[in-house]
Amino acid sequence: FTGATSVARHVMAAAAKNLVPLTLELGGKSPTIISRSADVASATERVAMGKLMNAGQICLAPDYLLVPEEKEGEIIEGLKAATAKMYPTMLANPDYTSVLGARHRERLEAHVEDARAKGADVVVVNPANEDFSKQNTNKMPLHIIRGATDEMTVMQEEIFGPLLPVRTYKAVDGAIDEINRRDRPLGLYWFGQDELE
């Protein structure tokens, strides 16, 4: 089985009940750290590509971003520029993928609304200012969620879509502590040029 931990529990219980051998590949919240020594343009281009490939519906897609607090604005702008370069349009662009279906899109939209209601600043990256409300393809633009907190569902569940929570850190140790206090991620991404970090 490949998929979410919550579903895997049911699959594993059914397999155990029937003594069926099982291998599980589970997703998780794969963090991405951009360090102070990173080339911001290069890092944000790679993060945007990783997050938007298949509309973020890849088990190893970056799930949240940890950035130095003084570089947050520059990094957000880099993500916007990288997205616009890859996908100047999205709705009619065959290279920009839809999410799995209406139910999945509604789940992602609920994460966005929950984050807004709990104080996040949501930046919708829509380079051509297209109207996504009048489409039947279940496409969603990138939503950057600034100020994401642990109370928000977007930080509690695997996203599997084009939503990117951003949290800031003062010191690299704080970013590492942030990762270590959570469940073990499936993947982790680091962007930086300082070997001591």
Protein language model features and the residues they cover:
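Conserved glycine-rich beta-strand-loop-beta hairpin in the small C-terminal domain of fold type I
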Residues: 137-141, 157-163, 181-186
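Short catalytic-loop micro-motif centered on adjacent basic/acidic residues
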Residues: 1, 33, 187-190
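Bilobed periplasmic-binding protein-like "clamshell/Venus-flytrap" ligand-binding domains
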Residues: 120-124, 184-192
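Cytochrome P450 core scaffold surrounding the K-helix E-X-X-R motif
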Residues: 151-156
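ALDH superfamily catalytic-core signature
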Residues: 3-149, 171-173, 177-178
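Short, intrinsically disordered, charge-balanced linker/junction segments flanking boundaries
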Residues: 194-197
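Active-site donor-binding acidic/aromatic loop of nucleotide-activated sugar
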Residues: 165-167
